[in-house]
Amino acid sequence: MSADPRLILPLDLSSVSEARAMVETLGDAVSFYKIGLELLATDGMALARQLKGEGKQIFLDWKLHDIGATVERSARVLAGAGCDLLTVHAEPQVMAAAVKAKGGSDLKILAVTVLTSLTDADLIELGYAFSARDLVARRIRQAIEAGVDGVVSSPQEAALAREIAGPDFLVVTPGVRPFWSAKNDQARAATPADALKAGASHLVCGRPITAANDPREAALKVVGEMAGL
């Protein structure tokens, strides 16, 4: 069994050397990697370029959130690096700037709707007048209007995203936990099969793989759960 390109493995590790070791351990079981804020300050871009040179796909989960001009300049640099996916916060000005910056590159812009660790109660505490589902729907529509390529949404909102956005929109779902693993801090988790059936185009699955005694075997088990869906 080989890698499924719909499975994205987050390299949420403390150093580039640890991340590099994990990639070597996983071998051909994973072909798509997410590089987040943990590695941003420790040569994460160098790792991204290295992995791209080895034929891997790269998702920069940096959740850009600043004034439009700053987001545009930053996204333009990242588009030139040849990465595949980049996250920005789902605010109209931010999304429009990132879309403008990517130009004719292959970079796909993903809007972050609502973090999967947040519950409806959390959103009320933060001052939002919407449930997670309603806020996700609102931001998906704004993302479509801004011209982004997809959204990051929890498995529970994947069907909503697919219904609103149609078949060609990317729906990347973190908070994916195989049936044999714990939910950890993902308040709105689902199995790989559940997320794909709901409409997800890509799944982000981390600790069930990286914290396993045999990460490669765990990755292949997840790929097996995705097979045929």
Swiss-Prot record:
Belongs to the OMP decarboxylase family. Type 1 subfamily. GO terms for molecular function: orotidine-5'-phosphate decarboxylase activity. Keywords: Decarboxylase, Lyase, Pyrimidine biosynthesis. GO terms for biological process: 'de novo' pyrimidine nucleobase biosynthetic process; 'de novo' UMP biosynthetic process. This is Orotidine 5'-phosphate decarboxylase. Catalyzes the decarboxylation of orotidine 5'-monophosphate (OMP) to uridine 5'-monophosphate (UMP). It catalyses: orotidine 5'-phosphate + H(+) = UMP + CO2.
